Structures are given as structure tokens and as C-alpha cells.
């Protein structure tokens, strides 16, 4: 065995440095997220406003017969002044019973300002961004709220978003928290529940606390309508329209705040096939946004968003590549097909990285009522070897799809997540 460092050794060093840098950044974000969690414990958003702004709730829906009724009924039940609220469901080129269900809800609720915009393959069918554009052009509210068609927001969800936005003129949008409605369905939905809580308390809450940065999710958020008008609506080329609109709000000089007291419950994929399709689409959409906005990295005017560009670029390129390469090195090394000459206890480094991951997720679960228990900690320990490894495949697929579609010039389409 040679005493010098070979190609595999340098690859191994690249992997270890990249993984530990990301772990350290996430530790810092988790500390920020926990500090913000402590702040939320003291918040009071129940005092009524002197004057409530008008709100238009947009619900893009394409073949959503399984969930649309529950969603719209939850929106009707929101604790918000009835004369200040309009609900606009964009029935976008649906071929199922979505339209019939909406018509029945309208018939049963004549006093509710429920508007159904029905499009066909000519006037609609251009993805979620296109549906949202159709909705906001019809809206009359000062604020726009967006909920996915599978969501059931809690009664105070919208009110808490509005209260938060009203306190700061520099807020362009406020996002709430989304929870997993079907978290007990199977092992996959249990993993998704833990993942989404970790992301929201670490990445969203942590970035807001430390950098006043936060990206809009696809649901449970409000945005000032005048800003959407100024930006010309949603980007119809963007699959991750939520992340894309976030960066344009940044560029206008506005902030986006995370308000976890506003909660909505959504249905998550129940099969690995549906989950992989959904998540690879998300990765593809986020890579599009990063490429579109990467030039901001070199702009002094927008230096405040450099962390987001660096962080998400690191996730999809630096961390992804290092995690895949390290897995390959581990497998080949275990089979005695390769050797490396780096001195030191590398096994200890792997164990420490694993323990840090478990600790980060355990802290995130401790901030959510009813989630910090031995069963979930056990799931966290297991998901590192299962769910997280599947994510590597999904992320790689998403990056490849972006490259392929960019080369072929393919347009974004409405890929609706299958409902259960």
C-alpha cells in the first residue's frame, strides 16, 4: 500500500469536508430555529386588528375530486371577517368531478363569496403558475393567500398570517407551517412528517431568525397583491413557483417571514413511486430557480440573499455529490475493491456525522407538540439509512431532468401529485 494520497483519498477528503460543512451550517440553523421557537411561545396574535384587509384565497385545482371538498369547506370555516374574504378556486382543465363538487358547495353556501374559475386546455392547463395567474387576475383582495387543493387549514391560520404581515411594511409575504395529515398511514408518511418538521424548524425558522430570509412553500402563505402585479404574476416556466417568487420578492427589497402558529394540514404521498415523482419535480424546479438567480451572488445590491443561494446550491450540488460519492466509496471499500490511505479513525467521523443528524432532527421534533417521543427518535435513526438514501436518488434524478429539459427546450407542465 502506498503511503501517499491517491485519487480515492482526495475524493474521500472532499466528501468528508463537504458533509461536515453542511452539518455545521445546519447546526447553526437549528440553534437559530430553536431561538425563534422560544420567541413564538410568547407571541400573541389573537388581538383583533382595527381594520382587516381584504384577502383573496387562491386554490389551484386540477382533477382534485378526492380532496377539494374538504379543502374548500375548511376555507369557508376560516376565522376571518366574511365581508373581507373571497375564495377563488381555479378548476384548471379538470376531467373528473372537481367542478360538480365545487358547484354543490356553492349551492349549499349562498352567503359565501366562493368563485370558481373553470378553464380548459386552451385557457388553462399551463401548470400551477398559470392557474395562479388566472386566479389573481380575477381577484379583488389587497392580499393573496394560496392553499393547495389538498389542504385543511386550521381556523386561525389565515388570521395569524394577516396579523403578522400587518406589523411590518417591509414584509412582502408571510408563510405558515404545513403538517402531514396522513402521517400515521405508513412508514413513508411517518418519515415525511419528520422531514417536513425538520426542514421548517431548522431551515425556515433558522434562516428567518439569523438572516431574515425565508422561502415561500407551495401553500399556507399570503403575499401583497400589489407586489405580484409589479412582478407580472407567477413565472409559468417555473415548476417550483413558490421558490421562484420568493427570490423575486427578495429582489424588490422585501422580506418573507415564517409564522409557525399558522398551521395547515396536507396530504402527503403514500407510495414511494408518487413521492419520488413529486420530490424529483421539486428538485428540478429549485435548480431552475438557482440557475436563474445565481448572478445575484455577485451583486452588492442583493448580497443579503447570498446565503440562500449558497445554501441551496450546496444542498443540490456540493452535498448531493459528496453523499453519493461517499456511499460508493463505502460500498467499494467494504467489498475490498478499493483502498485509501488517509490516516485517522474515519469510522468515528461517520458515526459522529450520523449522531449529529439524529440530534438535529430530535431537536426539531422537540419543538412540535406530540412529536418528541421514543418512536419518532427511532424513526429518525432509521431514516438516515433508508429515506435519506432514497432522497439522493430523487435529487440526482431532478438535476438530470433539469439538464435534459433545458437542452431539449421542454416547457413546464402540470404534474399533479396523486391523491389518496
List the predicted regions and their residue ranges:
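N-terminal signal-anchor transmembrane helix
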Residues: 29-84
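Long helical/loop segments within the catalytic core of UDP-sugar-dependent glycosyltransferases
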Residues: 109-111, 115-142, 155-239, 280-291
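Catalytic donor-sugar/metal-binding loop of nucleotide-sugar-dependent glycosyltransferases
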Residues: 246-264
